[in-house]
């Protein structure tokens, strides 16, 4: 079943049926002010932190309520509806709507009772408040009086848990008042006589506002109970039914902002207003609301500026291939998904309620990879930040606080860190993600000076980027298991594998092998011969260990338990085949050609499904070892034989590195949201963003996806497609082009900005090959192979590649 379509000309997804199988959401804002909005205007807002900066309330894991609601009421007939289908929920035979999710904005259009409305939700660039710009048009042949009411439900405390759970406290600290064109909410209002800089138990007055611009306020309400009324809900609030609000504030209940204006519309006439929401002191709120009196002009300009900003970032890499699904994901939605995970990590969505008050180390370092080719200047700032969250022993802080203070942080070795973050120990893989991320940034930009930039460690000391990477090697070397391979510690990438200080992870061993390959390149550049020799010797030892211990006839095992038990050997009754060791044996370069092809074939034969490759098989049930925490999940779910979507990016890349274009693209299309637009009732998640996992073949809901938007899938699939399928593989001194594509792709184009040059790349495939370069021309000059040295680049570089 289909609920909408992609409009690539505007880079929008257009929802034509509002009764989607789940809330389909979009992200608005920036790291300073974030907002999540669904196709029915549900969602919430927060300043900086979804945990400690919550502004608008949202109730998770129930109906998609409350939200950013605008009610319209015909003053003559007293009939009312909402500018989004919900919350009023008029009969869809008479109520028509569209929702356009774009890049950092959402538009909702509705037609009912010969009234057309269009509301545009966005956060202006470089601002920390949101705008609901509403246009109402009278499409009838008679004069109409339309009562318009905007409703925003405030949290009673900026902390999500305090607002939702600690009601004996949070309900008695807020009040609301009316200030001419806005409702002002004050948290801890009774502290308004404190001197500047003073607090009581770390508490001060916090101001929020809900304002109206472009029309006068005819009535208002600052109390949720007063607006909704007893035994009423968001679908039939008393304030809307009556056509007038009670003009009363909140004192010791639940605060809200509700503002009503009555618009008189002649036939064909349109009027615009704007509602504004934010966390600002009252004097600043007054200035903001007054700025939007000419809301039509300013809102148009702000929205256009926002579109140009995001489309500008996306324009740095665009493709035109025979696959529309591939094009829309790479050009727009996978790219935008990468930016959202880059900004919000796993801090705030409809699944992540905001309790993770910081950046996960491994998550964030991987997320950076997805935007390096689009916004290297943004990427390097986050790389610096994450390097400064590396402990001086080489490990990463499992959770990096939003208030991170480099050089002064506690670590998992300190009880205070464990108590504050809930993370009791280091993870084996965290710092190893730095190697490909730093390498990709330097290779994309050619900024080799970055390797010598000095950055502090999280707790104490400082060092160059090169030194940070060496410390990461030290961390792995200092945490080896019984056989001499890297220990799994509290977790490797798979949080459901608790291997401890003696158990060993093949996945981490392959990561470590790859890390040493990368660091050898940096050591060569630095002419650090002594350290280069150390890496060569260490890598050879590790390679022998992996080959001797981990290759099991036709697959790489997953590792060893603390008791030395093998995980993932052919004879195991459960979990005898694992996805990630096979893909990473290829990505790391450790597997020989025969092993690589045999391992990948086994993945395809034993793990692949129509929705992607499952993480392992068979699922755990009766034979899980003590550290196999995946057994807590239902079969076919998450780490217990679910289709863990992040791993799809790695299998795409692995197949592409082997030149298997058909197989690489097949893995992409199986798990691509856009390719499931016509099966929305099965997938349920948005058809324009990735989810964390899809239920596997052992689930009765095979194909249903979960945990939208904020997932490492966005970056791994982007890397798998850009570096793998499209073959864009820069290094320190230029760009290698090595596509691995479906045979039927006779021609495709890539537009890529690279080191100050705009590359227009045309790939021709008359022989229907999957991979291989016959000849490469750069500005008409034939290269000796498929590599473009940097000195061959011009301001506009025309590239023509023939596959063979």
Positions of PLM-derived features:
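Hydrophobic, small-residue-rich alpha-helical packing segments that form membrane-like cores
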Residues: 104-106, 499-514
């Amino acid at each position: 079943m289909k609920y909408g379509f992609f409009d690539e000309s505007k880079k929008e997804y257009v929802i034509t049926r509002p009764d989607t199988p789940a809330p389909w959401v979009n992200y608005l804002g920036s790291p300073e002010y974030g907002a999540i909005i669904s196709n029915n205007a549900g969602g919430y807002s927060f300043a900086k932190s979804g945990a400690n900066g919550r502004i608008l309330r949202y109730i998770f894991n129930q109906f998609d309520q409350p939200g950013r609601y605008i009610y319209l009421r015909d003053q003559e007939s007293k009939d009312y509806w909402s500018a989004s289908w919900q919350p009023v929920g008029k009969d869809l035979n008479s109520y028509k709507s569209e929702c356009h999710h774009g890049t950092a904005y959402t538009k909702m259009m509705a037609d009912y009772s010969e009234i057309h409305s269009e509301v545009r939700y966005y956060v202006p660039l470089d601002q920390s408040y949101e705008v609901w710009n509403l246009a109402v048009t009278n499409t009838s042949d008679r004069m109409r009086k339309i009562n318009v009411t905007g409703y925003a439900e405030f949290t009673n405390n900026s902390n999500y848990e305090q607002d939702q759970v600690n009601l004996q406290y949070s309900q008695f600290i807020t009040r609301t008042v009316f200030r001419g064109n806005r409702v002002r909410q004050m948290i801890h209002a009774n502290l308004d006589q404190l001197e500047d800089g003073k607090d009581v138990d770390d508490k001060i007055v916090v101001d929020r506002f809900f304002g109206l611009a472009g029309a006068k306020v005819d009535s208002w309400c600052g109390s949720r109970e007063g607006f909704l009324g007893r035994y009423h809900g968001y679908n039939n609030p008393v304030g809307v039914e009556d056509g007038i609000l009670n003009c009363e504030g909140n004192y010791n209940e639940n605060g809200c902002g509700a503002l009503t204006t009555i618009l008189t519309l002649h036939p064909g006439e349109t009027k615009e207003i704007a509602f504004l929401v934010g966390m600002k002191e009252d004097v600043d709120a007054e200035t903001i609301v007054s700025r939007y009196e000419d809301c039509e002009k300013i809102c148009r300009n702000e929205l256009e500026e926002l579109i140009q900003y995001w489309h500008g970032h996306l324009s740095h890499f665009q493709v035109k291939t025979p696959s529309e699904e591939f094009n829309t994901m790479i050009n727009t939605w996978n790219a935008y998904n990468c930016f959202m995970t880059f900004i919000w990590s796993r801090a705030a969505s409809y699944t992540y309620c905001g309790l993770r008050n910081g950046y996960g180390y491994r998550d964030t370092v991987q997320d950076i990879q997805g935007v390096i080719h689009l916004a290297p200047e943004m990427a390097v700032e986050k790389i610096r930040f994450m390097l400064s969250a590396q402990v001086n022993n080489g490990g990463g802080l499992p959770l990096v606080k939003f208030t991170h203070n480099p050089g002064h942080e506690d670590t998992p070795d300190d009880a205070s860190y464990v108590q504050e973050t809930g993370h009791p120990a280091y993870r084996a893989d965290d710092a190893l993600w730095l190697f490909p991320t730093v390498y990709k940034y330097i290779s994309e930009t050619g900024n080799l000076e970055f390797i010598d930039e000095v950055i502090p460690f999280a707790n104490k000391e400082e060092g160059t980027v090169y030194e940070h990477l060496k410390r990461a090697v030290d961390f792995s070397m200092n945490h080896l298991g019984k056989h001499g391979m890297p220990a799994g510690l509290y977790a490797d990438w798979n949080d459901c594998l608790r291997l401890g200080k003696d158990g060993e992870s093949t996945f981490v061993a392959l990561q470590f092998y790859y890390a040493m390959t990368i660091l050898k390149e940096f050591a060569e550049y630095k002419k650090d011969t002594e350290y280069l020799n150390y890496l060569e010797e260490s890598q050879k030892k590790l390679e022998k260990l992996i080959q001797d211990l981990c290759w099991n006839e036709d697959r790489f095992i997953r590792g060893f338990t603390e008791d030395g038990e093998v995980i993932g050997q052919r004879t195991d009754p459960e979990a005898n085949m694992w996805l990630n060791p096979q893909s990473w044996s290829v990505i790391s370069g450790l597997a020989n050609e025969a092993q690589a092809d045999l391992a990948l074939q086994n993945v395809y034969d034993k793990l692949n499904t129509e929705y992607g490759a499952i993480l392992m098989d068979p699922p755990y049930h009766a034979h899980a070892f003590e550290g196999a925490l995946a057994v807590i999940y239902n079969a076919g779910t998450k780490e217990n034989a679910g289709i863990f979507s992040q791993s799809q990016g790695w299998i795409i890349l692995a197949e592409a590195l082997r030149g298997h274009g058909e197989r690489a693209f097949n893995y992409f299309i199986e798990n691509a949201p856009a390719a499931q637009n016509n099966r929305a009732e099965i997938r349920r998640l948005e058809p324009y963003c990735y989810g964390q996992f899809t239920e596997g073949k052992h689930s009765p809901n095979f194909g249903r996806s979960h945990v939208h938007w904020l997932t490492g899938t966005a970056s791994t699939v982007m890397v798998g497609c850009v570096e793998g399928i499209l073959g864009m593989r820069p290094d320190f001194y230029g760009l290698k082009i090595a596509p691995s594509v479906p045979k039927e792709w006779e021609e495709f184009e890539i537009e890529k900005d690279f080191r100050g040059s705009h590359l227009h790349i045309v790939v021709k495939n008359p022989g229907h090959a999957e991979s291989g370069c016959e000849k490469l021309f750069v500005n008409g000059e034939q290269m000796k192979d498929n590599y473009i040295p940097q000195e061959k680049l011009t301001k506009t570089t025309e590239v023509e590649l023939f596959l063979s």
